[in-house]
């Protein structure tokens, strides 16, 4: 990913859970979750799914290309019943399956990436902000030697 006037660039690499192909030739990127659906997950996982969608629509050489991706979402299994097989090598989950749509907003994702790459292009990091979650993560990582 490159932006004019920004020296830093990036590429996206990762492992998505699954994709769907629709009858009209479009695709969806799906992330599986074994938990109770939570509206906060939309924002939390939305950027990850947007990154997968961007990478699939703009692949590098010899990489999988799926385009256009028109839907993103989380497919939840909210386990209610868990049964262990007699040999304890098999587990069966029972529960409710829920689909949560995540809006595909490529312009928001690219705006985020432009901000990240602008920041990475600075000669020195800016002073940390008390309201910056990334700054808090960085401080915590340094505190624990990461």
Where are these regions (language model features)?
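Catalytic cores of nuclease domains that cleave nucleic-acid phosphodiester backbones
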Residues: 1-29, 35-37, 61-70
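A generic fold-level signal
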Residues: 11-13, 44, 127
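Metal-dependent nuclease catalytic regions and adjoining charged, substrate-binding loops involved
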Residues: 58-146
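Active-site metal-coordination segments of metallo-dependent hydrolases
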Residues: 38-46
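Well-ordered beta-strand positions in beta-sheet-rich domains
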Residues: 13-15, 46, 99
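An active-site-proximal "capping" alpha-helix that borders the catalytic cofactor pocket
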Residues: 45-59
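Short acidic/polar capping segments at secondary-structure boundaries
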Residues: 34-36, 79-80
């Amino acid at each position: 990913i490159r932006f004019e006037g920004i020296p830093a660039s990036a590429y996206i690499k990762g492992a998505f859970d699954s994709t769907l192909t629709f009858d009209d030739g479009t695709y969806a990127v799906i992330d599986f979750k074994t938990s109770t659906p939570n509206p906060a997950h939309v924002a939390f996982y939305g950027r990850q799914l947007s990154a997968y969608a961007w990478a699939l629509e703009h692949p590098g050489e010899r990489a999988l290309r799926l385009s256009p991706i028109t839907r993103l979402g989380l497919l939840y299994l909210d386990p209610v019943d868990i049964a262990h097989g007699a040999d304890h090598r098999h587990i069966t989950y029972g529960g409710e399956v829920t689909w949560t749509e995540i809006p595909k907003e490529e312009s928001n994702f690219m705006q985020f990436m432009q901000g990240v790459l602008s920041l990475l292009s600075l000669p020195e990091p800016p002073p940390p902000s008390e309201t910056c979650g990334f700054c808090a993560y960085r401080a915590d990582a340094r505190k624990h030697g990461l």
